[in-house]
Amino acid sequence: MEKQLQYRLGMWLAEKKHQPWVRGKNDCCTLFMEWHDIAHGTKTLKQIYGKYNDLKSAITWAKKIPLDKWFPEHGYKQVEDLQDGDIVQVQHDRRFSSGYIVFMGFAWGLGDNTGGITRHDLSTNVPHTIWRYANGS
């Protein structure tokens, strides 16, 4: 990740720190799509923003946009090592995935009913997939 983009990611995460979790507007899926749009000048977030507001409708949308297909379609490749800017996909029991953004050795994400963005240790044994933006690099 270029230093300028890395700086921008850090500043953006700091801004997100105190924004409340709101399903469909500021959650685990909107987080990585919003960052993708900022980093790459796209408008992917609009396809889900505000279109679900409870767990049932979130799962319905997750089925329409499976992340294991979304990432490759938007220029990402699966990798094994972690770098700033990567997105960690964690599959949950309820048939949907969460996305966390890697920055400074931690995964940053928005969980259900959290007060804002939270930091997660990457050394746990939680099954996950790492995606790195490959277009243009």
Identify the role of each PLM range:
Residues T118-S137:
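Glycine- and charge-enriched low-complexity intrinsically disordered segments
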Residues I48-K51, G99, P127-R132:
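Intrinsically disordered, low-complexity N-terminal regions enriched in serine/proline/glycine
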Residues M1-W61:
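N-terminal capping segments
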Residues D54-R119:
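...with weaker cross-activation on analogous glycine-rich loops/strands in unrelated enzymes
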